[in-house]
């Protein structure tokens, strides 16, 4: 119950489709719906809404119709490892000298998001190589983000920028610095990966959630250990989930399980994950109530992603 006596809505459980890479996208969505997930974080890649495939428009329309029938919402994720370069993981990035292909890909991803009715597109900075000066990398990133925000404004999409361990922007402080460089643009929001908070942030995970709330538009979740960037199934890491999920109470955007390395047992892992999260969320409400409850995040994008 909230402090006003009104029961807080359930969190919007979602699953990242990179964890179902061995499934056709429509099959993955049906399975997730059957398990009780209300959202899908769709990773654009060769097998799932390939942004360069012939017939993309028809496939997007087909998936949009399926999402409607299943009553599911969507976020577009862009973390495919070899989507743009078959030999170099995640290349090029927004801080590469040859960033044009990444910018074009992200622009296409926003168009797909708009056609699906998905209000958020996820993105990240990239790894800074030793031969690139720090100030050059930050200047490139800010410049490319400014251009992407122009497209986002035109299409009505909010960017959900993810700090990623080992990349130029790897923590909340880095995100806040970049957002300040962009003038606090209302469509520049945060994708918070709960495991990353455990991995490298100085504060405890629940405190990271509370710090993130003013910018929060998308959440990725999995277990993790301190100092080790490895996405683990729930219960295999060190995170105390009830207070973390209690801190998210009232947040309406996706809370999306990200276990891309568990495709070999995707349906079973997805089932275990939602069972764990529901139990931990109930325990969080029982122990912590709704103190520190979430708002809508940037540009209202904490609201449920969907077509209608």
Task: Identify the role of each PLM range.
Residues 59-70, 141-151, 208, 243-247:
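Catalytic-core regions built around general acid/base machinery
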Residues 75-77:
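Conserved alpha-helical segments that form or flank metal/cofactor-binding pockets of metalloenzymes
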Residues 48-51, 85-88, 129-134, 198-200, ...:
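A short acidic, helix-capping loop that chelates divalent metal ions and anchors anionic groups
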Residues 16-20, 45-47, 79-81, 126-128, ...:
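Active-site beta-loop-alpha junctions enriched in small/polar residues
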């Amino acid at each position: 119950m909230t402090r006003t006596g009104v029961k807080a809505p359930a969190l919007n459980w979602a699953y990242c489709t990179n964890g179902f890479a061995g499934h056709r996208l429509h099959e993955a969505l049906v399975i997730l719906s059957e398990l009780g997930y209300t959202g899908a974080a769709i990773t654009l890649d060769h097998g799932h809404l390939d942004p360069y495939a012939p017939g993309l428009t028809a496939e997007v329309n087909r998936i949009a119709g399926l999402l409607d029938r299943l009553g599911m919402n969507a976020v577009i994720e862009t973390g495919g490892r070899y989507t743009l370069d078959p030999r170099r993981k995640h290349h090029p990035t927004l801080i590469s000298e040859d960033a044009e292909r990444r910018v074009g890909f992200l622009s296409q991803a926003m168009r797909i998001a708009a056609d699906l009715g998905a209000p958020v597109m996820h993105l990240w900075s990239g790894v800074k190589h030793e031969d690139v000066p720090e100030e050059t990398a930050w200047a490139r990133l800010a410049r490319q983000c400014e251009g992407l925000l122009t497209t986002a404004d035109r299409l009505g999409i909010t960017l959900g920028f993810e700090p990623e361990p080992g990349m130029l922007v790897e923590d909340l402080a880095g995100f806040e610095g970049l957002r300040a460089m962009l003038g606090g643009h209302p469509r520049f929001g945060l994708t918070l990966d709960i495991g990353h908070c455990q991995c490298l942030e100085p504060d405890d995970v629940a405190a990271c959630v509370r710090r993130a709330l003013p910018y929060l538009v998308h959440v990725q979740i999995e277990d993790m250990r301190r100092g080790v960037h490895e996405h683990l199934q729930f219960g295999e890491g060190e995170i105390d989930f009830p207070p973390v999920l209690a801190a998210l109470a009232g947040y309406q955007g996706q809370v999306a399980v990200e276990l891309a390395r568990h495709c070999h047992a995707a349906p079973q892992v997805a089932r275990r994950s939602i069972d764990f999260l529901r139990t931990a969320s109930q325990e969080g409400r029982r122990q912590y109530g709704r103190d520190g409850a979430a708002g809508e995040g940037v540009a209202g994008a904490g609201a449920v992603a969907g077509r209608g």
